[in-house]
Amino acid sequence: MFDTLFKNARLFDGERFFSGSLAVKAGKIAAIGDPAPENAAQVIDCAGLTLTPGLIDAHLHFAGVSEIDADPALACLPYGVTAAVDAGGAGENTLEACGVLRRRPIGAKYFLNVCSAGFSSLRAYPENVDPARWQEDRIALLFERYPEALCGLKIRMGRECAADTRPVAEAVRLARSLSTRLMVHVSDPAMPAGEIADLLGEGDIFTHTYQGRGNGILLADGTVDPRVREARERGVLFDVGDAHVHFAFSVFRRAAGEGFFPDTAGSDVTDRGLCAPGAFSLPVVLSKLVTLGMDEAAALRAATSRPAEIFGFSGGRLRVGADADLAVFAVLSGVGSFTDSAGERIPANYLLSPRLTMRRGALVWRSVEWMG
C-alpha cells in the first residue's frame, strides 16, 4: 500500500518531461509510471499540473545571523523549495550560532564568508574583505568540523567592498587550500567583471551574472566578455542571484542571444525580497527566465538536478528510492508582470504557480486554492 499517489501528472524528472503518476511510501519515491491508484491511502489528481523534484535554491539567505536572512519555512516551503544554499551570511565567528547544528525544515548547506562576521553588518556598512583580516586557521577548522554542511567560501566584490582583485585572488588561494569552491558576488565591481572571471577555476561560482550596474559580463558593444566565456570553458559556474537588484532583462537578453544561460537559478531572496514584486521567490525567478526565452526544461534543471550535482544534495531528480521531496505547480500564462532592476516591466507569459510541497513524504505546504 502506497501512502500517497500523484496521478495524471506532467512529470519533470530533473532532465525531461513525461506524463504519468508517482507513488510515495515511507518517505521515499516508491514507483513512477502507472502505479495502481487502489493501492494508495491518499490519491492526489494532478491533471493539468506539473510535478517536479523539490526545487533547490542555489543562492538564498537564511542562516539566521544577519539582518538580511529570511525564514526558510516561509521563503522555501510555500514555493516548492525543499533544499537551499545559504550564500555567505555566516563567517567563522558566527557560523556555529547560525544553524549548522539546528534542524531545518529544508535540506541546507552553507557558503562560509571569508569575513569573520559574515553579513551581520551588511545594512550598516559593508564587510571588510581585506585578506589580512581573515582568520584562516579558524576557517580551516570549520571546514574540518562541518564537511557536509559547508560547500564553499563566499566573497563579495562590489565596489563598496573591493578596489582591486587582490581579495578575490586570495580567496581563490584559500579555497584551493581547503579543497573547496569559491562563490563570488560580482555586482557593480570596481574592475571589469572579466578580470574577476579570469581568476576563477573549475567549480567556482560567479553570481549575479545578469546584473546591469556598472561593470558586468557584457562589453561596451553588448557582447559577452570573452574572459567570461573562457571562464565557463574552464568549468566556472554562473548563477542568476536575482534579488531583483541584480537582474537586468536587457543583460539577460543579450547573453541569451549568445547562448549564455545560467548553470543555477539562485533567487538571492532575503527578508525584504521575500514576496516583494521583484525577486519574490525561486519559482518567480524561473518564470522570468522562461518568459525571457530560456528553455523550460533547462530552467528547471537549474533549480533541480544541476544544483543537486554541484552541492551534493540527494534530491533534484525523480527516481525510485529517493527521498520524496516533491513540488506541484500550475503553469499559468498572462497573469501579471515581472519587473527588473532597471524598472523594465514585461508580461508574465509563463508563471510557475505553486500548489503543493512534499518533504520526505510529508505534505508540508498546500495551496488553499487546490485541494487535490
Model-derived segments and their meaning:
Residues 74-156:
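Divalent-metal coordination cores built from histidine and acidic residues
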Residues 55, 81, 150, 260-262, ...:
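A structural motif
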